[in-house]
Design a protein with these regions (language model features):
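Soluble catalytic domains of enzymes that build or remodel membrane lipids, polysaccharides, and related
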Residues: 17-241
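Acidic, histidine-bearing metal-coordination/catalytic regions of metal-dependent phosphoesterases
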Residues: 1-25
Length: 241
């Protein structure tokens, strides 16, 4: 089936088990590419869908806003979201393309705690580590290893990376969960084939040496407003539910 770019993203529920972690519902927002044909009305509808799931925390995986006159309005809609444990995120490649300082301001206005090779701690002790975009900011395997070496191995650890690379390093560094976007699950032909040449994992849930790794197809689209066998989604990760 072809899923047009005007289609609303579907909720994709994914259950994972993480020993020692509290019950938690995590919503993911990735690759919304706001401002490129995605109206504020459509984004508001998607956010209403996301909020209706009542997630404990929202994790933003980059490529959020592109260009357009309504940057502040999009940011304010995100900031209005009722997320008990907060909103944390990382930059994607497009945050660098549209301007680093502009993107930092958008994240700030949207109430997103930006993680740039940093770790934050959620209320309750769960750690969230995030890296700059692996390719655009030239993050190395060693950078990932150094970041995760500083985390508390006695507490659950979530690792965020826009680009779905270095999963093995994340797993060996103690991450229990890893979340990425970027691929759009190919979005349309022929990119669905080309993306598989670039990345060992493109979409869905994987087990990497015991670490659960989910790659999302993204909230909307980039470029052509069409999707082929790669519907847009709002992932809701149910931990130990």
């Amino acid at each position: 089936a072809i899923y047009g770019g005007a289609s609303s993203p579907r909720v994709k529920r994914v259950a994972v088990s993480v020993p020692g972690a509290p019950k938690m519902k995590i919503a993911l927002l990735s690759d919304s590419h706001l401002g490129l044909g995605v109206s504020l009305k459509r984004f508001d509808k998607a956010m209403n869908t996301l909020e209706a799931e009542k997630p404990d925390v929202l994790l933003v995986l980059g490529d959020v806003f592109e260009y357009g006159p309504h940057r502040r309005a999009y940011a304010e809609r995100l900031a209005q979201a009722d997320i008990p444990l907060g909103v944390y995120g990382v930059f994607g490649n497009h945050e660098y393309y549209v301007g680093y300082e502009n993107s930092k301001q958008f994240f700030k206005d949207a109430g997103i705690t930006l993680l740039e090779n940093e770790t934050a701690e959620l209320p309750g002790g769960v750690q969230v580590a995030g890296v700059k975009d692996v390719r655009t900011a030239r993050v190395s395997k060693k950078d990932v290893e150094n970041l995760l070496a500083k985390t508390d191995k006695s507490r659950p650890l979530i690792y965020l990376s826009h680009t779905p690379l270095y999963a093995e390093e994340a797993a060996s560094g103690g991450a229990d969960l890893m979340f990425s976007g970027h691929t759009h699950n190919g979005q349309i032909f022929p990119f669905n084939y080309l993306v598989r040449l670039q990345f060992p994992r493109v979409y869905g849930l994987f087990d990497v040496d015991g670490m659960k790794f989910y790659i999302t197809s993204g909230m909307f689209y980039w470029g052509v407003p069409l999707r082929f066998l790669a519907p847009a989604e709002i992932p809701v990760i149910e931990v130990n539910e």
